[in-house]
Amino acid sequence: MKLTPRQQEILDFIKSTLEVLGAPPTRMEISSAFGFASPNAAEDHLKALAKKGAIVLEPGSARGIRLVEQLGLPLIGSVAAGSPILAVENMQGRYALDASLFAPKADFLLKVRGLSMIDVGIFDGDLLAVHKTNQARDGQIVVARLDEEVTVKRLERSGGQIRLIAENPDFEPIIVDPEAVDFAIEGIAVGLIRGAVSKLS
């Protein structure tokens, strides 16, 4: 998808408006921001962006613009040192799954590596649907970060101690010392996908 410089500017404006207002801009707002003579010029640029697959236009709505990259769920691969888990450099494409199929809704997919959770049916290569949150209840399966390593384990808190429990007797629990390692809960498991899933990008 090759965009002209102007199309890229408009796409960036749509993204920034979504981040600030929580909604896409109107044609009038785009025209005003870029000094177009009328909203029709903005409409022409939007149609060009839609034709190139960067956005989806929803007729009948003044703010009926949807970013294609918002469709589906991002797959997180290896997590770059020091980066947020949803940083662009960690993403390995997007998959055609509706986030609202999960409760609470899924924010990303994580490819499972290893056999530490096989006793609860989570196998190497599965896609784990994860709701991004730093809050988790005792006993929930979490995606946790220990320094720069991301792991999937069951959370257990007892006597002021945090333990990450594997669901495989071959693996010892991980006892977390927050003084010694950089520990953070990145999310909770809300579903599991195994088998063919359509990739969007």
From Swiss-Prot:
UniProt cross-references to InterPro entries, sorted A to Z: LexA (IPR006200), LexA-like (IPR039418), LexA/Signal_pep-like_sf (IPR036286), LexA_DNA-bd_dom (IPR006199), LexA_repressor (IPR050077), Peptidase_S24_LexA (IPR006197), Peptidase_S24_S26A/B/C (IPR015927), WH-like_DNA-bd_sf (IPR036388)
Site (Cleavage) residue list: 81-82
Record-linked Pfam families: LexA_DNA_bind, Peptidase_S24
SUPFAM superfamilies per the UniProt record, alphabetical: LexA/Signal peptidase, Winged helix' DNA-binding domain
Reaction(s) the record says it catalyses: Hydrolysis of Ala-|-Gly bond in repressor LexA
Gene Ontology MF terms: DNA binding; serine-type endopeptidase activity
CDD domains, alphabetized: S24_LexA-like
DNA-binding segment(s): 27-47
Entry keywords, A to Z: Autocatalytic cleavage, DNA damage, DNA repair, DNA replication, DNA-binding, Hydrolase, Repressor, SOS response, Transcription, Transcription regulation
EC number: 3.4.21.88
An example Gene Ontology biological process: negative regulation of DNA-templated transcription
Catalytic residues, chain numbering: 116 (for autocatalytic cleavage activity), 153 (for autocatalytic cleavage activity)
Domain of life where this protein originates: Bacteria
Subunit structure: Homodimer.
Summary of the function given for this chain in its UniProt record: Represses a number of genes involved in the response to DNA damage (SOS response), including recA and lexA. In the presence of single-stranded DNA, RecA interacts with LexA causing an autocatalytic cleavage which disrupts the DNA-binding part of LexA, leading to derepression of the SOS regulon and eventually DNA repair.
Family stated for the protein in its record: Belongs to the peptidase S24 family.
Identification of the protein by name: LexA repressor
Gene assigned in the entry: lexA
